[in-house]
Amino acid sequence: MPNPAFSARIERMKLRRKGTSDQLRVATESISNQRYDGLEKYTLLEDVLHLSESWENRGKGDSAIRYIIGAMQPVDARYTEISFETASRIENQLSKKLAHNLDFRVQGSVPLDIHIKGFSDVDLLIIDTQMLMYDVNGGGSYSPTSRDGRDVIIELREAARDALEMAFPTALVDDNNAKSLRITGGSLQREVDVVPSIWWDTKEYQSMKREEDRGVTIIDKNTRERIYNAPFLHIKRIKDKCDQCNGGIRKSIRLLKTLKADSKDEGSDIDLSSYDIASLMFHADANNLNHSTYYELAVLVETHRLLNYLSQNYEVAMQLDVPNGTRKIFEKPESHVELLKLTEMVNSVVTEVLREITGRPTDFYANDKCDVLRKQMVY
């Protein structure tokens, strides 16, 4: 029998993964008219818009199990490809219009394939190569410059803003964010955050010359504070650990991001970022996350275990680093409340899954029942 609570969540998840009615309207127009309207390869979505995804036929009806399985899956690769192509459109315009030597990189959820929206935002780093910051303790050889990197980044930001307004006259270029520009609308079917920056050559990068060890320097335009970040090391370390567990980390991250989105839709916002959630699950047990085909509920079991342990031992949680080691995941005591909210969402859904498996509506999930879920095949 369908579960009304999960019927609503499943419908929201379908919309999230395939797009809102307005997004689909533009997509459909692009397909039928074969217009270049932000859907860089309109044929990519021709099938996706109308066909169901494989997870929609797994489990029984609109159940907690079907919801969990669906929440773990990547969005269709054709949506993700269009996200990258939208970033490439921005890159091409900036390359042509700016008198700067620039490098471009995509960071965030999309390159990690942990986004849960078909029409996901894209984070595009634009990196001015005329100068860089470097760790003086490294072994590299550099020539000093009299230029202030903060001025270089702010000038790049202003030039990029003007170039984007010229290249995409019907789009909105928002210059209010302290660290990035945001371009939306017009012919673009993805919101793109454009992050002006320069390279930061870490000690490790100077030694090994691996790009994952190379960082970037960005600026808070309001305070002129330099912010050093290592997005490629974040991506590399999560990918490497995910490879150890048959994709289990990505599935757990998507699951938690979906629960967070549904919590907001149901009236309770959870103030943890996508970056925080990904960093949190990086500390999960890879062996526990490892699973065979059709045994994905093992991912839910480990997600439940880790969140409950950290919620009950917050002093341990506050010692955990983000994957690239640049800061702690939880930097303030108030984050405990947000972790508790997310944990409660997991606890609620894992109990519903257990009840669907056992057929006993009074069952409550506990760690001693983990094998019931781990051994359950979901076709």
Swiss-Prot record:
One of its GO terms (molecular function) is ATP binding. It comes from Yersinia aleksiciae. Its cofactor is Mg(2+). Keywords: Antiviral defense, ATP-binding, Magnesium, Metal-binding, Nucleotide metabolism, Nucleotide-binding, Nucleotidyltransferase, Transferase. Mg(2+) 2 binds at residues 123, 193. UTP acceptor binds at residues 107, 123, 179, 229. Mg(2+) 1 binds at residue 123. This is Cyclic dinucleotide synthase CdnE. UTP donor binds at residues 109, 257, 274.
